[in-house]
Amino acid sequence: MRMLTRIALLLAAFTAAPLLAQTAPVPSTPVAPAPKEDLVPVAIDTSLGRIVIALDRGRAPITTANFLHYVDTHRYDGQNFYRAMHMTSAEGGGGLIQGGITTDVRKLYPPIAHEATSQTGIHNVAGAISMAAAGPGTARADFFILLSDMPGLDAGGPGGDANGFAAFGHVIEGMDVVKAIWNSPISATKGEDAMKGQMLDPVIKIIKAERVK
């Protein structure tokens, strides 16, 4: 729950910032696209369809290896997308969906080192996949996919903090499925504090996650 709250609070700070700060890009050195051999495609089959994500093991090797560990041992199979965060039009629109392992902590592996966006050059933009975390070195299995650019989730981003959230890949197929999950019914009462009104009801099942060619 701590990692959920941290994302919610950072997003609240980000969306409360002046519009100029929200839309201004985070200064960074341009990064060349990752070579094909550094990208690992993974399919996430859900009850609403398939999402295919290219994981960037060249620029985010630790985070990618961790995600693949869960994929290869089938620990995401049978789990859920459980959250859909919607930003208002005044906040720039868009949002994110979040999923992972929430029902069986025995399936969790140890937390991993944080790979900041300032280190990898992979930013929290529309279509990116990032790890949920309560702080550096706490990410385990939960992840989110963005439907809009959110520079406030980058390291040192506007309205965010110095660490941000580790982005490690991007959707290459199935953004329509991401949007369908995002548009699914939300409970008006489930969730605590800043998370209230963001919990999917019912949750969207992750049938399986696997590497694909």
Regions found by a protein language model. Give the residues of each.
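Cyclophilin-like peptidyl-prolyl cis-trans isomerases
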Residues: 21-213
